[in-house]
UniProtKB/Swiss-Prot annotation:
Gene Ontology biological process: division septum assembly
UniProt-recorded name of the protein: Probable GTP-binding protein EngB
Cross-referenced Pfam families: MMR_HSR1
GO cellular component, one term: cytosol
Organism: Heliobacterium modesticaldum (strain ATCC 51547 / Ice1)
């Protein structure tokens, strides 16, 4: 799949603000500063489509990006950053839960984790929450350019073990800097949105 057109549509905090064009959606979840915005920008070949920030917890809304006029990527607020106020965190929880449990257009969830480190308690809690509500979620291990390629398999094994991810669920190694794993992620989105399997086997650990 190729992304030929991408546009930011809306930042939403409640269901009435969500797009009403009934297009399929894939949600991105992950710890603050794990690289969700950088992932979106790399996939869309746009530097500033999704705003990146050096300040964790900057994303406080559900941000909808329309892709090829046919589907959405939805960037959810990052979790697990202590400096964000308790009031803000308390408001994010119900907002994210309502979207993930109730949104009929949601076709899949992608959880992003930092490949450099073992999953955090927040990563594990999110995974357990998704499993509890039977929400299928793939995993992308970000910031792959920060470690030696020879260490990918070891780090992915740790992620799979800590998050209790079955072998049939892919973990894609990705770098927004080099583009490593980009085609794998595009294939995954195509599968979630359209049910289309990749034409060729790719490096998914």
């Amino acid at each position: 799949m190729k992304i030929k057109e991408a546009e930011f549509v809306i930042s939403a905090v409640k269901g009435e603000q969500y797009p009403e064009d009934n297009l399929p959606e894939v949600a991105l979840v992950g710890r603050s500063n794990v690289g969700k915005s950088s992932l979106i920008n790399k996939l869309c070949n746009r530097r500033h489509l999704a705003r990146t920030s050096s300040t964790p917890g900057k994303t406080q809304t559900l941000n909808f990006y329309r892709i090829n006029q046919a589907a959405y990527i939805v960037d959810l607020p990052g979790y697990g950053y202590a400096s964000v106020s308790k009031t803000q965190r308390a408001s994010w929880g119900p907002m994210m839960e309502h979207y993930l449990k109730k949104r009929l257009q949601l076709r899949g969830v992608i959880q992003l984790v930092d490949i450099r480190h073992p999953p955090t308690k927040d990563d594990i809690a999110m995974r357990e929450w998704l499993n509890h509500f039977k929400i299928g979620a793939a995993v992308i291990a970000t910031k792959a350019d920060k470690i030696n390629r020879g260490r990918y398999a070891k780090h992915v094994k740790q992620i799979r073990q800590d998050l209790a991810i079955p072998k049939e669920i892919p973990i894609i190694v990705f770098s927004a800097e080099t583009g490593h794993g980009k085609e794998d992620v595009l294939d995954l989105l195509d599968y979630f949105w359209n049910g289309i399997q990749p034409e060729e086997e790719r490096e998914i650990l």
